[in-house]
């Protein structure tokens, strides 16, 4: 069908309205694919490839290439807007150094760890991989192999990879890069509510009276959502915006109140607010008595370091997540020391400002939306910080109603939909199930048609532990997909690079571009990107969105899904399962892992005829792969509070927020009348907990593992900028974005620069015990640190700033703290 873009947009609007009303439209109006007569550009919808906001874009293709993108005016998330990265989506797939065929390190015609990258066929690549995997399995067993995935995997890619590792290879050594960004949020949700992901949604932006950003720079990291806050603030004079951070950034420009606090002291600020609420009789007793219980967190739990690290040895209760029941009076006593005087002293924030913030939470007539992302989660006490903010909302009853929302934002397009909901973490299964729970394993084994005892009960190696196990030669075969951890992860020189180059190990990296991670590998597999494949993402508000493949891949590049499924064909079940399992499931004897995982009568039950647009993966395997995987995965959540709609529905809408029950999405969870799982008459029902009550968890301030001293006298904070996404793999290959911000710089306070004899543009050496980098100084611009702190973004592959970061983690979530470590700054002569 041919139509103008205007007609296309009108048809989309009509289709959306008709879907709500249950009306069937003529094909010309219902079709979500269109072509412009004037330009011969075909348009289709897709979620943006970048952050976790989940904007929808219209993608224009011509002659097999993406030639244009624009904001989707029918999308409820972004309403036609895109940030600057989204506007240049059409260029991310066409960098000059795009990888087009497998590359294996070779010397004298065969694989060699010290050889040069040499083009090989897919058969040679997979044969080499399979040989290494089989040798490792035979010698050391399934714990010697591992996989590091991504919050950028599609739902189907993550599901297939997790199934291959946990059911096929029987190894839980799979973890996503979301471990570095969302793990503390996950554990915070699970401890407080017993179920993951926000209870609110983006509609809260249009209802809140006060916005509190806990360490988040939404103006640059979630700019489209920031426009909704901006619109709310500028059109409603009573609305207040509060921004808390360790340095000044662009979000402060809109703020009514800005709070620059000392690193780690957010713990003290949050506890002060809880104390203020109690002391000023602002507790919502009806809510607290009916819907909460009180717990005390175990303290002095260490920093997730190696067991022989002196800092870890000092901990009295290393890695303990235990909690004990306490009364309200005991909780009150635990926060009493956090007076305004004490909180001000610890944080550096003026007393009157702290009281101003606390009053907004305490006022029963003020609807408050708390927002956070990496500033809170990348924290050695990130789980505690998540809990402390929930405490404030629970004490006041400001939760799960329009405008009252503690909202954890995500940084990747499917950190929620894939990493969390699918369960690609080393300890998880789909729909909030975990490998350590025998009932959960039994559910997974039933859905996957596995004999009892297939899935190992012990969690696998998490991301940071994977690096250590590679370093120590315990983990020997390792597959990295859809991330650039050699640039993004911490302590590169100390753990990761030695692990990748360990002669005992074989490292495979699937990526579209020759990243720092790819260059450290032994085998590079070229990967299809974004709309070169069909897929689905899940965004920060529980919205699942799907898209069709719209262009072919470049060269011999293949999707991560194709790679996982095709690789599984290289293994007979006798090579991956012990005899006792095969004896329980003799039907799998002589079969391949592919037969067991994907040709199981469930994944392969949808014929190609059901695919409205045929995609390369489905064409290759002979059935509608994406639908089969999605529908099998959805079985985990339906009826368990994670209900998803039928797969085909997602291609007709701009996403739906789960749980989707009887065709209706859920905006506010846990609230009677909004959430179908909330019991009638309950008011609120936190059904993730057996008694339907959320937990208010007491946790104190505890110091970071390292602090500045006489030698390393400055704090270092790393992060992002508006124009680049994560390590810049895609955005630095977009000419306009590269020209806008070509290099990372060291943002420093002018007085700190002056004290070191530095001027703007001077080159400095930033160093600590873990390494050093050279970077130029910036004393002006968007980021303005206080004295004693520098900020350096990590998008620049020439400046591997994260190699200075200690691989300390929150002991409960295993998430790294990228926001504070001591360094020294010296001028390069």
From Swiss-Prot:
One of its GO terms (molecular function) is nitrate reductase (cytochrome) activity. Residues 1-30 form the signal peptide. Predicted to be exported by the Tat system. The position of the signal peptide cleavage has not been experimentally proven. Its cofactor is [4Fe-4S] cluster; Mo-bis(molybdopterin guanine dinucleotide). Pfam families: Molybdop_Fe4S4, Molybdopterin, Molydop_binding. Its main location: periplasm. It is an enzyme of class 1 (oxidoreductase). InterPro entries: Asp_de-COase-like_dom_sf, CT_Nitrate-R-NapA-like, MoPterin_dinucl-bd_dom, Mopterin_OxRdtase, Mopterin_OxRdtase_4Fe-4S_dom, MopterinOxRdtase_cofactor_BS, Periplasm_NO3_reductase_lsu, Prok_molybdopt-oxidoreductase. It catalyses: 2 Fe(II)-[cytochrome] + nitrate + 2 H(+) = 2 Fe(III)-[cytochrome] + nitrite + H2O. CDD domains: MopB_CT_Nitrate-R-NapA-like, MopB_Nitrate-R-NapA-like. Mo-bis(molybdopterin guanine dinucleotide) binds at residues 85, 152, 177, 181, 214-221, 245-249, 264-266, 374, 378, 484, 510-511, 533, 560, 718-727, 802, 819. The keyword rRNA processing does not apply. NCBIfam families: NAPA, PRK13532.1. Catalytic subunit of the periplasmic nitrate reductase complex NapAB. Receives electrons from NapB and catalyzes the reduction of nitrate to nitrite. This is Periplasmic nitrate reductase. The gene is napA.
